[in-house]
Amino acid sequence: MNDTTWSDKLRLRSHFGFTLMPFAKNMKAAQMFDSSSQRELLRGLQLWTDVRGLCLVSGPPGVGKSITLRRFVYGLDQALWRVIDFSYLPSTPTGFLRSLCRKLGLPMRMHGADLFDQAQSYLVSHQQDHGAHPLILVDDGEGLPVPVIDLLRRLTSSDLDSDDHFSIVLSGTEDLLATLAHPGLEPLRTRFSYVQGLRPFGLEDTRNYVRFNLERADTPPKLFNASAGRPRSINKLAVQALIQAAVQGRDEIDGDFMNALILSHPLFQGPPGG
């Protein structure tokens, strides 16, 4: 019921008097709400650009890791940084190297060793040749197997580790942390120059997030007091509540309405999450 069509959104906006649809997930980076934990992560990433190297971001699903990384990338000087981001992560080292070479505009090679050598050589020399420091952004990394994650370390190993010719940000859930605990990845664990976990919203952040979305939609009423601490879950419940309220002809949504909705929602039995 959360997957609404454009005409459905128009009807919802008309029912509540919104000029924009609140709780959207496709907002521009500069317009996004940031919690105290997200601000800490963003500031840490900005300071880490002076250090560079390997960075690890972790946190439960739906707490805003990808959104915060988008804000971080949005704020980078494109003349000084070249961001190579992965929206699809191959599950084999050769597949990862092929995807990396494709994004770098490099030719395909038959053997994995040749793919590795040309990608590493290109990344190591890119800043000297073009002036921009390469940044590989690997988001949703919890599904990566150990050999692919170790490949990231091996890519950065050159010139006896004397300089960080390019940087990598690896982000994922607790499952990624469990994979990183593998004994074979100990050399990688020791090389992260910055590690930060992203926390779910606290109660005050949740209130501010709801208020932020409603003010952006140009509507004055208070929608509800608070929900769970994960932005993705808040969005799901908020949109569900808006639709259900419109179906019932309600103009206001209060705590009792939200409690009843959560209890009847098949995906939110108990405290909201996911």
Regions found by a protein language model. Give the residues of each.
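C-terminal alpha-helical "lid" subdomain
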Residues: N2-L12, H165, E204, N208-R211, ...
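Walker A/P-loop nucleotide-binding motif
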Residues: V51-R71
